[in-house]
Design a protein with these regions (language model features):
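Membrane-embedded beta-barrel scaffold of Gram-negative outer-membrane proteins
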Residues: 33-35, 141-157, 272, 306-363, ...
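Flexible loop and strand-edge segments within Gram-negative outer membrane beta-barrel domains
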Residues: 55-75, 83-142, 149-172, 215
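C-terminal beta-signal and adjacent terminal beta-strands/loops
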Residues: 342, 435, 444-453, 477-532
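Gram-negative outer-membrane beta-barrel transporters
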Residues: 232-235, 332, 337-340, 361-454, ...
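Outer-membrane beta-barrel translocator/receptor signature
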Residues: 1-2, 6-62, 69-76, 484
Length: 532
């Protein structure tokens, strides 16, 4: 969960509540408070935020087992700064998150008195410091920063009233670094920005689920440095840079170059080309800690002891066209992309353990490619009245067919699972009258392959899912209560067409991971916001 805050520009307070209901009456209530404060001399400021959310569980097929979990979360924090001088600033941030989620049946009972429960309670505390120093001519900038986050999780992932399916996880991350930027009037052939720096990242993970014989301890440390130079002019921008990292789980340092170029041959046309490279260390990630219920047992993810790093090389090429037609501003974008993955991570089903639980091993496939084209268009009368749409065609395939099930009759598959070939979006925003705004938005997801696992692997199958179009509408109206206080009322419908998965698994032997399509059913929502 990421929290993005902003630097305050004036004193303000905002209090809001949004409440939503599905057709069956399932409620989702979210209340938030935000405040910005500035000192009279504008040398100090703070942005405070807090929110409380409560969402009921949702049972689509009325089988007594939730298809969307219940949620109870509280978030609070702040971001503040103090200008220590005319050319220096100290910034500090803190956030706290308490998040509880539970799905399954008999949610009013303790987890070990249910047929299926997937439950997790996270307590997250994090913060950071950053100090920036500029020279009077703005040509030199030095920044140093450090942040720390501590995550504590108490969980239960179990079936059939298992008293031993409780778990505890601790995960703390420290990041520290420094960066220097030098703005040059000319370097070789054009004005340029030179940036270099160093960073240290340490993550300490301990995940315990003794009922499943799992006691994972993982320490991951990465330290590295980077350098980048950007040449810029009105018609040409060129960026070249590189990063070198040493991770304690990889034998040799990893060198990751990157380059980008932007060229404007004529006033209304921008051409771009880029190359980036990267890697993923051979370690456990958040998704590896999750446990799913399948066929009355659970599925667990383990790491291949010989897991190797995953490397990527990505290329992009795009063209932007801008044009004014009367009062309408037009923008068209066409983009092609290609990514090659070497030793790509892959989940391979293995033989069940002695308790009958499904075992998936994170191992390496030889490689994979992701390539496609993307088109976007926007027409705007002004910032409040515009229409925007985009479409992407993408192919994601492994270099060789991969085994996704241990079933004797299950064919291998080259296509990446859960990766649609087609997806897109559309958004229409307008202000038909003073203080009134309206929006219509939608996302399209094409067909994809989703695995459906059963207790007997010979029954496993790949589902070719249907396409989905998730359409939403929203209206809002501003009412000036006083010269400085405004109330906004809003209402709308999410997923108007109730585009939702039709073949959700049923009962206590369900595959809890067999989920696809829009995340929420048709939901009517109403809101009110006060700002001053």
């Amino acid at each position: 969960m990421n929290i993005i805050t902003k630097e305050p520009h004036r004193n303000s307070v905002s209090l809001a509540n949004t409440t939503g209901f599905t057709d069956s009456g399932t409620a989702d209530v979210n209340t938030s408070l935000n405040a910005s404060m500035l000192s009279d001399d504008r040398r100090a400021g703070a942005y405070l935020f807090a929110s409380v959310r409560n969402r009921d569980n949702y049972d689509r097929n009325d089988d007594g087992f939730s298809d969307i979990p219940k949620v109870a979360s509280q978030i609070a924090g702040f971001r503040a700064y103090y200008k220590t001088g005319a050319y220096s600033k100290l910034t500090f941030e803190y956030h706290h998150i308490n998040d509880f989620r539970r799905g399954g049946d008999h949610l009013e009972r303790p987890p070990h008195e249910s047929d299926i429960t997937e439950q997790a309670r996270h307590s997250i505390n994090g913060g950071g410091l950053q100090f920036d120093l500029f020279t009077p001519n703005q040509r030199h900038k030095i920044g140093v920063y450090a942040s720390y986050q501590d995550v504590r999780r108490e969980s239960y992932y179990g079936t059939d009233k298992n008293p031993d399916a409780y778990g505890k996880t601790s995960d703390n991350t420290l990041v520290a670094g420094a960066q220097y930027t030098y703005r040059m009037h000319k370097f070789l052939f054009l004005p340029a920005h030179l940036t270099f720096g160093m960073e240290y990242n340490r993550n300490n993970l301990h995940d315990r689920m003794l009922g499943y014989d799992r006691d994972m301890r993982q320490m991951s440390c990465t330290y590295g440095g980077y350098v980048q130079n950007e040449w810029e002019s009105e018609r040409l921008n060129f960026v070249i840079g590189a990063r070198i990292d040493k991770n304690n789980r990889i034998g040799n340092p990893v060198f990751s170059p990157r380059a980008n170029i932007r060229y404007t041959p004529v006033r209304n046309v921008i051409l771009r080309a880029g190359y980036t490279s990267g890697y993923r260390a051979p370690q456990a990630y958040d998704e590896d800690l999750h446990v799913n219920a399948v066929g009355g047992n659970v599925s667990l993810i383990v790491l291949d002891p010989d897991l190797k790093p995953e490397y990527s090389n990505s290329f992009t090429l795009s063209a932007d066209l801008y044009r004014n037609t009367g009062k309408v501003q037009l923008n068209l974008l066409a983009e092609g992309f290609y990514t090659s993955l070497d030793d790509v991570f892959f989940l391979e089903e293995r033989a069940p353990d002695s308790e009958g639980n499904l075992i998936f091993m994170r191992t390496n496939a030889r490689g994979a490619t992701v390539r496609g084209i993307n088109f976007e268009a926007k027409a705007a009368l002004d910032p409040d009245n515009y229409i925007q749409a985009g479409y992407t065609y993408q192919r994601s395939t492994y270099k060789e067919a991969m085994s996704w099930s241990t079933g004797a009759s299950q064919a291998k598959e080259k296509r990446m699972l859960r990766s649609p070939d087609h997806y897109g979006y559309v958004s229409l925003n307008g202000s038909p009258a003073k203080s009134l705004s309206a929006s219509v938005y939608g996302t399209f997801s094409g067909s994809m392959l989703v695995p459906h696992y059963f207790e007997n692997p010979d029954d496993d199958r790949l589902k070719e899912t249907p396409c989905f179009f998730d359409l939403g509408i929203k209206l809002s109206y501003d009412i000036a209560l006083t010269r400085r206080v405004t109330m906004q009322v809003s209402g709308g419908v999410k997923n108007v067409l109730d585009s939702f998965q039709k073949d959700i698994d049923r009962g206590k032997t369900k595959d809890a991971g067999y989920i696809y399509g829009p995340a929420f059913p048709r939901t009517f929502h109403f809101g009110v916001r006060f700002t001053m």
